[in-house]
Structures are given as C-alpha cells and as structure tokens.
Amino acid sequence: LGKHRIMCGDSTDAGSVAQLMDGEKANLCLTDPPYGLANTVSEKNNYDFYNDSKDNLKEIVAKFLPLAQTVAECIVLTPGISNQSLYPAPTWIMAWFTPAGVGLGPWGFCCWQPILCYGKDPKLAKRMGSHPDAIVHTEASEKFGHPCTKPINFWRWLMERTSEFGELIYEPFSGSGTTIIAAEQTGRRCYAMELSPQ
C-alpha cells in the first residue's frame, strides 16, 4: 500500500510482529484493541477471529501489549471504559469526551472514554511543550461493516497529538483500516496487522 504495510497475521504472535516490522521500530503504536464483543456484535457479523470474548480478552492484552512495547516507543490505545481494568497501569490517561454517549453500560450511556498511554509523551520528550490531553468529539463513525470503527477525525487528532509527520505507526488490530487512512492523511507511515482476511 505505497509507504504503508498491512499483514494478515496475529499481533499476539512474536514471529508475525517481527515479520511485519522487518527490523524497524515504530515511533507510536496506535490501536483500538478488541472489546470482548463475542456473542453480540462480533459473532453476528463474523468478526470473532480473536475469540473476542470477555474471558479471552485478558489473554489477548497480556500477549499483544508486551510485543507492542518491543516494537514501538510509545503506545496509545482505546480500551473501552469497561475493559480498562484488564490493562496494566498506564503512564497517563487522556480522555475522549462524547457528549451524545458511546456504548451502553450497566449505568447507561458513557459520555467519555479513556485513552491509555504507555511511555513518554512524544511532544514533551522532543521539547515541543505541553499539548491537550482531552478531545470533545461528536462526529459519528462510518461503520464500513466493522463493529467498532473509530471516527477518522478523532483518530487523526490522536495520531497528530502523539506522533510527528513522517514517523512510523504500528497498528496491531487494523480492523476497518482507520489507522492506515489517518496515517496517509497526516503524512505518516503505518504498518498494520489484522487477523481477519476480510
């Protein structure tokens, strides 16, 4: 895909990740990991390639996150508010505010989502000053046949907040390809992994 790469493979497998990266190290891992949607959205739409159940999600996190830390300088991910406890304590938490509400939980619609950050803030590390760590976003995502597509303008904001022009982005759960599109639109390269051949 021009300067980008996409590989059909498993981001919880060290050999597959090494093959995708081919010795390069990413400046940023930006991803929207599985949410544990089996028996609901994923199963109905044949997306359950990760055995994406709540029971299995902890194992997915335990495998992909350490691998991502070996190939990327920092990691930024959107776990979904109900899955945040499955992840190790982050270095920082940014916030995505969605006034209309996203995702029905046990207490109703949640109006914000955590963005977990691991590693140093790239802007502060490069002495570029402090930048906002919250975004208010009301744009609806285009589904593209995928259950959890992120709005492209939100994803672009997150990419520009956490990386620089020309840098390399690693995406372990490519899904509908939003990270590749955002990388193309913002002048970055993206190496993406997706288990589903679709």
Stretch-by-stretch model annotation:
Residues 1-192, 196:
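Core catalytic lobe of class I
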